[in-house]
Amino acid sequence: MRRFISTMAQSGPRRFAPLKEVVAGQHHELPKLQGVIFDVDGTLCQPQNHMFGQMRDVLGIPKSVDILEHIYSLPTPTQQEEAMESIRAIERVSMAQQVAQPGLTDLMAYLDSRGLRKGICTRNFEQPVAHLLTKFLSGSVFHPVVTRDFRPPKPDPAGLLFIARSWGLTRRVRDERDEQAVRDVIGVGQGGNSAAAPREKKQQQEGAVGPDAHGHHEEVGDASGLIMVGDSIDDMTAGRRAGAATVLLVNDVNRHLSDHEHTDLVIERLDELVDVLDRGFVGREIS
């Protein structure tokens, strides 16, 4: 099992200082929340689970097979692109029926009022994401927006670490043990989809500087001050492996993830986070 990148071993539940005190300039011993990263389908908009069955039907794969992994495993670039376009077509049709999650605009207005950065990390392609932001959140800035074109996708933590690094949130790699933890998370030397990318692109996608000539990283994206909000196990696992706190937006389909070891907090509506963050984020105790 890959470990997550963290600045120190965690003890007890994840906590962040109350935002109402941070904004008021009050000193607090708890860490300050640095930003929030959101998934899209099932998180910013209501779930469109019908898409996944349609995608698997058109690809001819069972539910047990990951859709993107299947496409990336196809033998030729032409086959990969044809398969990718077949699922894009399904998403284009479905995006016209997007419905905003309850509490969406209230939460975003609150985060904007508190000056918090917002990013997106999704397995969707860019068109449905742009459609949602234009339709429901035209006055709210999300940057960066990490979509399907970024590889490797969730549950790999690379997208979250890239966002952290783009926000200037980095840490130095301390020693050989820490270096091994970094390698375990970002998969250096283990192959994978990003291994064939040019070095510059690979470093950017890993959210890391390095490796140098000796295979060591100088610094990595530090997501320990971030929250990942999502509705799937991929979201919770990517957040946990990146070192971020995780929030599950629960529904009838994913309720079993409420007790998952990668889930720090569970909410029924997005605007529940307003009070949680204002009073101070406290995750659940995980044994």
Say what each PLM segment does:
Residues M1-Q34, A109, H131-S287:
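Asp-based, Mg2+/Mn2+-dependent phosphohydrolase catalytic module
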Residues F4, Q10-H70, T76-Q79:
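Active-site neighborhood of HAD-like aspartate-dependent phosphohydrolases
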Residues L44, K118-C121, M228, V266:
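Conserved SAM-binding loop
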Residues N49-F52, Q101, F125-Q127, I233, ...:
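Alpha-helix N-cap/helix-start and coil->helix boundary motif
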Residues F52-R56, R88-E91, V129-L132:
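Hydrophobic alpha-helical core bundles mediating ligand binding, dimerization, or RNAP-core interactions
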Residues Q80-E91, S140-P144:
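Short, basic/glycine-rich phosphate-binding loops at helix/coil junctions
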Residues V93-I120, E126-A130, P157:
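Short, acidic loop-to-helix structural element flanking the phosphoryl-transfer center
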